Amino acid sequence: MTKWKRANPNGTRDYLFEECTLIEEVEQKLRLTFLERGYEEIRTPTIEFYDVFAFQNRPIDEEKMYKFFDEKGRIIVLRPDMTIPLARVIGTQRWDTPLKVTYSGNVFRANESHSGKYNEIVQSGIEVIGIDNVRAEIECVISVIQALQKLNVQSFTIEIGQVQLYKCIVKKLSIHDEEERVLRTYIESKNYAALSNFIGEKKLDRCDETVRLLEKLPRLFGNLEVIEEAEKLASSNEMKMAIARVKEMYETMETLGYGSYISIDLGMIQHLDYYTGVIFKGYIYEIGEEIVSGGRYDELIGNFGETLPAVGLAVQVNQIVKALQEQQEPYERNQIDIVIHYELNRLAEAERLRNLLRKDGKNAWLSLFSNLSDTFQFARKNKIGTVVEAKNEYLVEYVWNEKWVVQKEGETSCVTFKLR
């Protein structure tokens, strides 16, 4: 049973050197930005009971979850989402609200083979709990824009949508669940022809304002002109209020000087069913992939306890790293300046010398070889020009000049030993 021992499971990969460093840096900068804005950290387990994700409407397809059994035979999953476990934490305890929380961790979701998506990704995010007005959405968007700015992410945009508008249309036109799932894909993919055929097959009246709004929905993306178009076709107070929320957000962000980062897309519909109002997606132009997603979910926490309004968003750390790699110079591993070769009974002196050299700005390594010749060979292979040997009674510095030559000698006990 060793067929797969040299391979990674589908949708996973190894991260090496630069990517590990960048992932850590991105997570840390996001974390610090969110902490500076008053968010408090929450960590949830990597594994959760299946029941946490199995409530009404199943916001995450069962087939997308990695499932297994615990020692008592209960079904456990690798968390496929960060927001739902946070909703469990908030719903099962009593809190003083408003509450602002932040998190970071790995998410596991089985995507279709050859979809180009990874099944394990890193997400960092924020949630504002207990506030049902537009200030919560604005706080989230400001926070993520400032975080992306600090990461020096270039050419990004945050799209604002409104899932409540879509839900109002579906309700008013009495479209049942199966049809709604098909309709959703047409609108999300901006498949105008398929949407037009859907309206024809359903024999919907194209003169009706709501039907006209439905047909226009995938085209309603851009700036405030989009809002004006939607307002003309809104046939209920609920629709008008949903549109007004997006308008207020957009105008506020423009006033704050963030208008260049914001656009409107009323045809955007999140694939997770727990969203109830304003939704967000963020993109970087260069890679064309989603880097931010989220929205308002006023009914989710109620599945675990007291119903509380909430809004949040997640940053896709792996996609940020991909963008930063394309923006930056090719990665070079840290160059070693000096290798210290030592006899084992002189390790303490060698370690003191290493610390001293690092304080002087030198990248000094302790050799892992017992033979000096092997240390020399390692140094040459890695283009390191200096080797210091800590012998029984003294230090010897070797430099490469077509061959290894002795540069200077000093007493081992002399902690102030300096290289040129």
Swiss-Prot record:
Presence of the UniProt keyword Oxidoreductase in the record: no
Predominant cellular place of this UniProt entry's protein: cytoplasm
Keywords in alphabetical order: Amino-acid biosynthesis, Cytoplasm, Histidine biosynthesis
GO biological process: histidyl-tRNA aminoacylation; L-histidine biosynthetic process
A Pfam family this chain is assigned to: tRNA-synt_His
GO molecular-function terms, A-Z: catalytic activity, acting on a protein; histidine-tRNA ligase activity; transferase activity
GO cellular component: cytoplasm
Annotated localization: Cytoplasm
Xref: InterPro entries: aa-tRNA-synth_II (IPR006195), aa-tRNA-synth_II/BPL/LPL (IPR045864), HisRS-like_core (IPR041715), HisRS/HisZ (IPR004516), HisZ (IPR004517)
The organism's place on the tree of life at top rank: Bacteria
PROSITE patterns to which the protein is assigned, alphabetical: AA_TRNA_LIGASE_II
Pathway: Amino-acid biosynthesis; L-histidine biosynthesis; L-histidine from 5-phospho-alpha-D-ribose 1-diphosphate: step 1/9
Family named by the database record: Belongs to the class-II aminoacyl-tRNA synthetase family. HisZ subfamily.
PANTHER family per UniProt: ATP PHOSPHORIBOSYLTRANSFERASE REGULATORY SUBUNIT, HISTIDYL-TRNA SYNTHETASE
Subunit field text: Heteromultimer composed of HisG and HisZ subunits.
Miscellaneous notes: This function is generally fulfilled by the C-terminal part of HisG, which is missing in some bacteria such as this one.
HAMAP family tied to this protein: HisZ
NCBIfam families reported for this sequence: hisZ_biosyn_reg (TIGR00443), PRK12292.1-6 (NF008938)
Job of this protein: Required for the first step of histidine biosynthesis. May allow the feedback regulation of ATP phosphoribosyltransferase activity by histidine.
Protein name: ATP phosphoribosyltransferase regulatory subunit
Native source organism of the sequence: Bacillus cereus (strain G9842)
Record lineage: Bacteria, Bacillati, Bacillota, Bacilli, Bacillales
